């Protein structure tokens, strides 16, 4: 349940960031977004932090939720011991794949290269930035203090199970 909450939180940030970029630039091709971090810095910083959260880099909540999944897998009993390592290996592979498709967007956004002309600043409106910022801060804060979320979810899960 923790991973579902974490995943939805950071995916919301990423979708909001993508929506803001599409709305302000009209661009949907990643190659056309070189230098977008200079044009839309707040949006792209949120997108970058959301990307780190989805990959599972500390101090984002994604790290904590993946850590908990890995520990749960390693603590399993009643199965062949090599199967306990299957969960952490899959988590690591998925993190590498996620980094492979998100980090090029972030890196090209902030480091477009010398030959790219960066246009004027065109940051999203406050009605788009505020929710994105709140969720971004929440993902980092809950990553640093995960007990705030686990203490909230534990009674709910106990009642359901």
What is each PLM-predicted segment?
Residues 7, 33, 62, 106, ...:
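Divalent metal-coordination and catalytic microenvironments
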Residues 37-44, 95, 99-161:
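Cytoplasmic/organellar membrane-interface segments at the starts of transmembrane helices
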Residues 1, 66-75, 154-161:
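Membrane-interface interhelical loops and short amphipathic "cap" helices
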Residues 1-8:
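Short alpha-helical catalytic segment bearing the HExxH-like zincin motif
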Residues 9-14, 157-161:
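Alpha-helical transmembrane segments and their membrane-interface exit regions
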Residues 12-77, 81-95, 120-138:
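Interfacial and helix-entry/exit segments of alpha-helical transmembrane bundles
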């Amino acid at each position: 349940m923790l991973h579902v909450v974490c995943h939805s939180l950071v995916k919301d940030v990423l979708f909001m960031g993508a929506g803001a970029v599409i709305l302000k630039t009209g661009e949907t091709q990643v190659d056309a977004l070189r230098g977008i971090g200079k044009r839309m810095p707040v949006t792209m910083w949120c997108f970058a932090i959301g990307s780190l959260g989805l990959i599972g880099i500390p101090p984002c909540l994604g790290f904590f939720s993946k850590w908990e999944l890995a520990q749960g897998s390693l603590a399993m009993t009643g199965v062949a011991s090599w199967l306990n390592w299957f969960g952490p290996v899959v988590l690591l592979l998925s993190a590498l794949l996620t980094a492979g498709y998100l980090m090029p967007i972030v890196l090209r956004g902030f480091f477009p290269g010398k030959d790219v002309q960066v246009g004027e600043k065109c940051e999203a409106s406050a009605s788009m930035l505020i929710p994105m910022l709140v969720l971004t801060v929440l993902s980092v804060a809950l990553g640093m203090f995960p007990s705030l979320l686990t203490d909230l979810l534990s009674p709910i899960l106990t009642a359901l199970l």
